[in-house]
Amino acid sequence: MVIVLVAAFLAGSHLHAPVHASLSAARDALTSAPAVQPLPQPPEVAPAAPAAVPIPAPAPADSGFGFADVEQLAQQRAAKPYENNSPKLPPAIAKLSYEQYQSIRFKRSDALWRNQSLFEVQLFHRGFNFDRRVVISEVVDGQAKSIVYNPNWFDFGKVVRQPGKLPRDLGFAGFRVHYPLQTPTYKDELIVFLGASFFRVLGRNQDYGMTARGLAVNTGSKGGEEFPWFTDFWLVKPTDPEQRVLTLYALLDSDSVTGAYRFDVRPGRITQVEVHSTLFPRRNIQKLGIASMTSMFLYGEDPAGHRFNDYRPEVHDSDGLMAQTGTGEWLWRPLTNPRELRINRFMDEHPHGFGLIQRDRDFTHYQDEDAHFQRRPSYWVQPLGDWGRGGVELVEIPTDEDIHDNVAAYWVPEQPVETGKPLHYDWLMFAHGDSPQWPPGGKVIATRTLAATPDEVNDLDRSDARRIVIDFAGGDLDGLDRTQPLKALLTANGGQVQDVTVEKLSETGSWRVSFLVLPSRPHETVDLHCYLQLYGESLTETWTYQLPT
């Protein structure tokens, strides 16, 4: 079931576009034809992916600081009205430009745990949009101690002439963790926490792209979105110099909710983050977004999206929403850059997983030697425990530039969020640097839409008819001869489809489905679903799409 919400762009409801000061660099955006059948429920084609288990992270000492302490702090804070206790920035750094802020560098030689662990921590100075103080503590042998601000840890360049006069309670804006991802001799950026509850994580051979969030509140709502902040962090010092899992805790706070978080980070080719969270609502909340992530999609291979004066064939950090439902069905929703705010919710129960995926890994499809969109990570969320009923919500926001995150995805619980009732959500998040090797069946590799030809329009007497072309590849499709009687199983809610064809492309070996879509009423929204079947067996994931884009 899909709930569709389409609205005019609402002032104040747009997504927060993470500022790129946290990164190594900035973005340096039917009459039915014989092939058409009613859409049955596709069978489960594989177990939930990826097959992973919670990270065996080292636990703090029984008498030491741990997740229960953060839960207690969050619960105590939720019992009181929200307060922003961050001290104002001193005049010397209160009005820094983006370029000035970028010039303030943490000295690598002063990194926390330098030469003591595989992990090192560098701190971000406050300034520019990152004006809130974040309290960062170190946990050693079970004891937590706040890290006191020291201006000598930073190279201010020409921005601050007398850094020694900055107050010692200035605090920090966030931090980043370094780890030898690529080679044993250099510690690369692994995970960054900077601004609100945003964080970014990398695996091997990946470049920063999309962003994860601790929590989303009322994203896309008419009253405007609320941005909770991670106000406090506790970084657990590794007890073994060769320890390969890092544990940290965080306290989240906002007008509506507080939260306690535990992150266990395991670096690798596919970096894995295990998240445990307990939320304490201060008041009833219209909509919570659990395991939220944001990304950028300006345009892809669809010619209908090429409305920009840009030489690059495609520009995006992610090109689709992928999900595996509680019944085992795999869904693929190509992303779009709509002309007005669009929100879709894919209803489900006990979801196996979802994520924003960068499926296209071919440099020639981007032609951007600076951005390297083919290296952007995909984030996949696998729930731990029973998340019950709810839905994966996809938010797509119009944008004319590739510097803004205009896509969001997250889980929305069906049960209302009520004051005083704690909520528990745990999940695994994976940062993939290449195309995930699931679903195991055929996958959508391209979606193209275009206006019907003049002849088709004349024959149909419908100027709003659209031609859809979908290419599938992978799984059992690759070994099929072109004479095999594959069927495209299609549904069109709000319209009908005609002129359906299925053919194997001789040059690529992929299978192409092509059809016309006619809205039931002129310019009405049409929800489409399609997958390929052979002798009653589903061979592909389910492609889902919405017109108009």
Predicted stretch roles:
Residues V2-G12:
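Hydrophobic membrane-insertion alpha-helices, especially the h-region
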Residues L10-E44:
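Signal peptide processing junction and immediate N-terminal pro/mature segment
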Residues D62, G66-G223:
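Solvent-exposed N-terminal domain segments of exported/luminal and surface proteins
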Residues E99, V192-S197, V201-Y208, Q286, ...:
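A contiguous, surface-exposed recognition patch within enzymatic or periplasmic domains that forms
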Residues G209-G268, G385-D400, H404:
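Extended, loop-rich substrate-binding clefts of extracytoplasmic carbohydrate-active enzymes
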Residues A250-M296:
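Acidic, contiguous internal or C-terminal segments within carbohydrate-active enzymes
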